[in-house]
Amino acid sequence: MVRCRTLVAAALALLLTPALAWYKPAAGSHHYSVGRAAGLLSSFHRFPSTRRSESPALRVGTVPLRNLEMRPSVRSLALCVKDVTPNLQSCQRQLNSRGTFQCKADVFLSLHKAECQSA
């Protein structure tokens, strides 16, 4: 019964068309988004002046990426999203929203500059 519900929820999620973009690139960014999940990683490419304010979730239990000490060689790495493969069996409905699901996904990244430019 649970598996049937999961399959029905996944089928409905695939049939519905997205209404709006789920992220917006930073204004004046010098980096281009690659792949469907590039918006999730766009903070790696932004300059401190163009970053959005911290969300309350970050303040509670995690350390924001910009406060971490990173070597210059790590900061200058090219990072691009090569592919995103969602795991529909891991999807769970969010309690505070009627049509929102949280799913796990495999995200394939590349740190090689040549691969990022060819994508």
From Swiss-Prot:
One of its GO terms (molecular function) is G protein-coupled receptor binding. One of its GO terms (biological process) is protein K48-linked ubiquitination. One of its GO terms (cellular component) is nucleoplasm. Keywords: Cleavage on pair of basic residues, Neuropeptide, Secreted, Signal. The gene is Npb. This is Neuropeptide B. Pfam families: NPBW. Belongs to the neuropeptide B/W family. Detected in a variety of tissues. High levels are found in the lymphoid organs, central nervous system, mammary gland and uterus. It is found in: Secreted. It comes from Rattus norvegicus (Rat). The keyword Secreted applies. May be involved in the regulation of feeding, neuroendocrine system, memory and learning. May be involved in the afferent pain pathway. Residues 53-119 form a propeptide. Residues 1-21 form the signal peptide.
